[in-house]
């Protein structure tokens, strides 16, 4: 009986129909772990087959996963891709953008059971198994706080299944140097080979040149983040230059693409457009 109850707990997933936004999407409540549940908002393509890809869309501090998902619908409607937008609720996952590994003030969270460094791997396994998908890789996008999540997942995710990623306008970063985590990797070292792997990935790194407000309401102003620059644009420039230096140090060319959007500030919709083109490329149905 106890074994049955354990299995019931593992596979307890709730399907919901949601029409509260301006489009229809489905929701699966992922509860197959000991962490707090996460609602996965998703939209299926016209036809799902073994070649269908999965693209994860990670929200920012606003946590409005439905709005983030809506920005991809028109461009993806004829593509062979499942769009998935996890909703990390604030009460359940207050520090989602650090993968739950540290607070935004820099305090390490020692309870690894709440860490989100296995989250995308588990979410992908669900969709892969449910729809019999052949690909072992997925695509992922994050803007602002979502960009923080994605670049740290590239560093600390339990899987290495990211095929392509696009990240835009993070408020601050984890540098590959000896500063205390989450500003650096002190006390949170990367596994062997991880630097070379993340350097080799196809990543679009986006910044808006007008995202330079040092007094933006959601900008992290802790000492560690201020050492990275006074605003998002400067911090992004410094982080990308840092990656180039790390690549030279490890004799590993940085494959990431760098793109500055002229005249754009911290605008989710406008910054998402180049990511859409980048990640949806080559996802047409095959004859």
Please place each PLM-identified region on the residue numbering.
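Residue in the alpha/beta-hydrolase core beta-strand immediately N-terminal to the catalytic nucleophile
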Residues: 137-139, 164
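C-terminal catalytic histidine-bearing segment of alpha/beta-hydrolase fold enzymes
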Residues: 234-287
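Serine-hydrolase catalytic machinery in alpha/beta-hydrolase-like enzymes
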Residues: 28-44, 51-137
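The feature captures the conserved acid-bearing segment of alpha/beta-hydrolase catalytic domains
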Residues: 163-245
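Gly/Ala-rich beta-loop-alpha elbow adjacent to hydrolase catalytic centers
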Residues: 142, 146
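Short glycine-enriched nucleophile-adjacent loop
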Residues: 147-158
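Sec-dependent N-terminal signal peptides
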Residues: 4-16
């Amino acid at each position: 009986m106890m074994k049955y109850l354990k299995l019931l707990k593992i596979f307890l997933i709730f399907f919901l129909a949601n029409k509260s936004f301006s489009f229809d999407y489905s929701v699966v409540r992922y509860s197959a772990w000991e962490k707090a549940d996460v609602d996965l908002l998703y939209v299926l393509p016209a036809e799902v087959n073994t070649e269908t890809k999965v693209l994860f869309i990670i929200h920012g501090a606003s946590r409005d996963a439905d709005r983030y998902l809506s920005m991809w619908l028109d461009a993806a409607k004829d593509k062979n891709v499942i769009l998935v937008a996890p909703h990390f609720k604030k009460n359940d996952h207050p520090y989602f953008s650090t993968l739950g590994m540290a607070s935004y003030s820099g305090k390490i969270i020692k309870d690894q059971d709440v860490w989100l460094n296995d989250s995308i791997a588990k979410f992908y396994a669900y969709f892969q198994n449910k729809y019999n998908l052949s690909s072992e890789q997925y695509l992922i996008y994050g803007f602002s706080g979502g960009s923080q999540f994605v670049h740290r997942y590239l560093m600390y995710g339990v899987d290495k299944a990211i095929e392509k990623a696009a990240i835009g306008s993070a408020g601050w970063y984890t540098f590959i140097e000896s500063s205390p985590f989450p500003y650096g990797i002190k006390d949170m070292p990367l596994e062997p080979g991880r630097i070379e792997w993340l350097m080799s990935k196809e990543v679009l790194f986006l910044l808006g040149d007008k995202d330079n407000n040092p007094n933006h309401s959601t900008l992290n102003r802790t000492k560690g983040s201020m050492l990275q620059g006074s605003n998002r644009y400067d911090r992004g420039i410094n982080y990308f230059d840092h990656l180039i230096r790390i690549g030279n140090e490890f004799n590993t060319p940085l494959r990431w693409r760098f793109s500055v959007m002229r005249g754009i500030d911290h605008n989710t919709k406008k910054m998402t457009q180049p990511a859409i083109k980048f990640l949806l490329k080559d996802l047409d149905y095959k004859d």
